[in-house]
Each structure stands twice: as structure tokens, then as C-alpha cells.
Amino acid sequence: GLLANDIEEVIVSSSLIDHAASEMPNPLHVMPGNDSANSASKTVGETLNDLLGVSSADYGSGVGQPIIRGMSGSRVKILDNGLVNRDVSGLGADHINDVDLSNVQQIEVVRGPSSLLYTNGTIGGIVNIVDNSIAQEDVQRLVKIGLETQSVNDGDSQSIFYQDNLNDINISFSYKDSSFGDFDVPNGSIIHIEEEHHEDHEDHDEQEEELGYLANSDFASESLKFGASKTGDWGFIGFSLANIESLYGIPYHGDEHDEHDEHEEEEEGHEEHEGERIFSTTDSDKFDLRGSLNINGNFLSSVDFFFRDSDYVLTEQHAEEDDEHDEHDEHEGHSKGPTTFANDTIEAGLIFDLSNDQLSQKVSLNFVDE
């Protein structure tokens, strides 16, 4: 057995006195919006991949979930302007984070247990994506046009952003359309795992050498967002409408799924899986109402309020290669039908600011119907 003197000694020390807040490691990192806007189209995970303690869990070009301190999925939550993004990315490694990074003011990352101060169930951390669709201060006219091309997948992306103050009403509009094909890869870089009893093993070796792309690595998305707000000494009030639609392939290897198909027509089934199209589509609509009223009373300083109505649908589908142009339709004759994840959420809340010169405190009331 293992003897006690064989175990390496670990000494843990702590201080009996409190450390100053400035001396403690800061778990919060704020990334300016320009850092993400000036780079190529990326997922949330890829955008934050260079931060300390943050990495990306890629599952094709469309999916890149952030990993914070080794934790991901439901332990890391994505927030949209302070509210939890109610997609289904936490239910599967191949589910996309349904967020729009085309018009980002800043990205806030909180690592570790400190994230519990902002939302529950996030021991890993949170990523808060902040935009200015509901402006809290008067804005000036700004126009941005973006164009992007990628040779590795014959892809392109176009975006436009406009904001202005018209008759004391702040308005903003953003639109982005991206389309990226399958990734080109060096010949022979994709290795096929063949079963020992396959008679045509040599034929497949020749085919893999001719393969020049990664099947089901494509990604396409279209996002649209409009917002308007009114500001003054009394506070602000505004609303925004957003829609995101996407289609992305899920890289797949047919042979790995054929090990359980021990029937007489194994070779025919294998050929069908080789040409199988695996992809997911998403469609989300979101309405936000947000505002703040300055009370400036002896007991109550201000009242913030918000309301969000969001509808999200993710559909996973299988299609044969010949029917690739009918990706949004049902495919007859296939043994596996589409799988749909849907989440309709209504969320509302009030935040009462009871702060004064000696004390800073707030009381929050939240309601969620999911």
C-alpha cells in the first residue's frame, strides 16, 4: 500500500488579516469592442481564446464554446447586456452560442466563483456581451461598413452599422450576413477508421488521399438588430428588436457510427454514411425593453427596469448528399428525423438603488418564465 511518508508534503498558508482589494487578483477582464470587431469572424470561444484561463471548445467552424478555468457548458453562462442568453448551448457540445458579435461595445469576462455575484449556477464564469442598441446617453452619427473574405473556405461576410440621434431619439441598426463553405485541408489529413473486415480497405485509402476538404465544416448566419431610446435628466427608456438565423455543419465521420450496424448490407450503409450531411439550423427572435428613472430621494436613488421576450429554436438534421439543397426540408426515406430544441422565455425585473453617501446597496426583483 501507499505509505504516508511517500506522499509529497504540501504547505498551505494564509493571512489572518484582510488583504486590500487592490492587492487581490482581479477576476474581471473587459475586452473593448474594437478588439473583436477588427478581427475575422469568430465564435465567442475564439474571440476570448487569448485571455488567461480561457480557451475554446471547437466543434466545427460555427461552434466555439468558451472554457473558463477548465469548465464549460452549463457552468459557463453567456450574458447579453446583463441578462442570460436563453439558448441551448449548455445542452450539447455541438450547440452554437446564439449571440451577435458584429456590434459589440465591450465583452466582460468574470472567471471563477466571483461570477456567482452576477447569476446563479456559474461556478466556471460568465461572459457578458454588451452592445449599445439601447443607448443610455445621446449618441452621435456613426456609420461602419465591414467586408471580409476567407480563402480557406471560399467564404465572405458583409456587415453594416448605423447609429444617430434623430429628433432627440437615439436609433441604431446593424446587419451582418456571413457565408463560409467547407474548410480546405491538405490531402490525406483526414484519416478514415476502417473496420478490419472491410474488403475495400485499399480503395478507401486511395479516396482519403484525394479528399481536399473537411465535410460539414461550413457555416452561414444572418443577424439583424434595431434599437431606439430616449434619454434625459430623468433617466432613459428604450427598446430593441433582434433576429439571428444560422446554419452550420457538424463535422462527422460515418465509419465510427457504423460499428453497431452489423447487417448484411453493411457496405451499402457505409457508403450512405460517407455522403451524409449533418447540420443544424437556429432561429432566434428577441425583444428588449429597458429603462431607468432617477428618483434622487433620501431613501430611493433610482429604479431600473427591464423586460425581455425571446424565442429560440435549434434543429439538428441529417440529409443525404444528393439532397443537400433541401437542407431546410424534411428528408423522406431517412431513418432519423430532425431533432428540435425550443426555448421560449419571458424575463422581467426591477432594481431599486438604495445607495447614499455612506452606503451602497441595491434590491433586485426578477421574474423568469422559461
Walk through the language-model features, giving the residues of each:
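Hydrophobic, lipid-facing positions within transmembrane beta-strands of outer-membrane proteins
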Residues: E8, G64, I123-G125, R141-V143, ...
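N-terminal periplasmic "start-of-domain" segments of outer-membrane beta-barrel proteins
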Residues: E9-A37
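N-terminal periplasmic accessory domains that precede
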Residues: V44-T47, G64-I67, L79, H95-N97, ...
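Extracytoplasmic beta-strand/coil segments of soluble accessory domains associated
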Residues: G45-D87
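Short acidic/polar hinge/loop motifs at secondary-structure boundaries
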Residues: V84-R111
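Extracellular loop and loop/strand-boundary signature of outer-membrane beta-barrel proteins
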Residues: G92, K144-L147, S157, E209-L214, ...
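Periplasmic-side early beta-strands and strand-to-turn transitions of outer-membrane beta-barrels
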Residues: Q140-G146, S157, F161-T282
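Face-selective signature of the C-terminal outer-membrane beta-barrel domain
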Residues: T231-I244, T282-E370
